[in-house]
Amino acid sequence: MSTTTKSKMEGPKTVVVTCGATVPFPGLVNAVLDRRVLAELAQCGFSRVMVQYGRGFAAEFERQVGAAGAVRAACDAEGLEGCDAHAWRWQGLEIIGFAFHAQMESLIGTSAALVVSHAGTGSILDALRQQKPLIVCVNEALLDNHQEQIARRFEALGHLWAIRADVDELAGALARSTRETLAPLPPAYKQGFAELLQDVAHR
């Protein structure tokens, strides 16, 4: 793969997980909060995971965090003002959850050393144009598969890692992110992401 310079992030090494604002993605949340994935995150040197889990999913998110064995903690992370964010601790790993963030791309730009995202094109673009390493998790429960087609095509071009909502696949992708460097998104996105997607789909 082509190499790209990774920007140095200040503060705790953070992975930002975005599940989409409107439709919850339980499979991705389940995978992220699995103890094996949390352990892999710690093994990869992360000390904080921020999870944007979507509206209407707060109670279930808190239940799953508790089931993983995390304990409630104070939330003092920057950039989350007005998000009603809550924090937990799991063996030294800080877990922060919130339903929605109005400036998700900005949060990714300032906080993320790695992004784990659902396969919505907007979220993919948020991460790629910030030149962040990106793991895209395809929601197989959706009726159409255009998101999977886009994610797999971008993976083939070396821009991201595409997986299913599976604990083993996510843990494996996290490990790969420590060994591999992705190709940056070309300047073509400035002409409009729709044009870029059309171009990618027909290569």
From Swiss-Prot:
What are its E.C. numbers? 2.4.1.141
- InterPro entries for this protein: Glyco_trans_28_C, UDP-GlcNAc_transferase
Q: Which GO terms describe its molecular function?
A: identical protein binding; N-acetylglucosaminyldiphosphodolichol N-acetylglucosaminyltransferase activity
Q: What Pfam families does UniProt report for this protein, alphabetically? A: Glyco_tran_28_C
Q: Describe the reaction catalysed, as an equation.
A: an N-acetyl-alpha-D-glucosaminyl-diphospho-di-trans,poly-cis-dolichol + UDP-N-acetyl-alpha-D-glucosamine = an N,N'-diacetylchitobiosyl-diphospho-di-trans,poly-cis-dolichol + UDP + H(+)
Alphabetized UniProt keyword annotations: Endoplasmic reticulum, Glycosyltransferase, Transferase
* Record's signal peptide: none
Q: Which domain of life is it from?
A: Eukaryota
| CC per GO annotation | cytoplasmic side of Golgi membrane; cytosol; UDP-N-acetylglucosamine transferase complex
Any keyword rRNA-binding?
no
| GO biological process, any | dolichol-linked oligosaccharide biosynthetic process
Q: Where in the cell is it found?
A: Endoplasmic reticulum
How would you summarize the oligomeric state and partners of this protein?
A: Heterodimer with ALG14 to form a functional enzyme.
Q: What is the protein's known function?
A: Involved in protein N-glycosylation. Essential for the second step of the dolichol-linked oligosaccharide pathway.
Name the family: Belongs to the glycosyltransferase 28 family.
PANTHER family assigned: UDP-N-ACETYLGLUCOSAMINE TRANSFERASE SUBUNIT ALG13 (PTHR47043:SF1)
Q: What is the official name of this protein in its record?
A: UDP-N-acetylglucosamine transferase subunit ALG13
By which gene is this protein encoded? Answer: ALG13
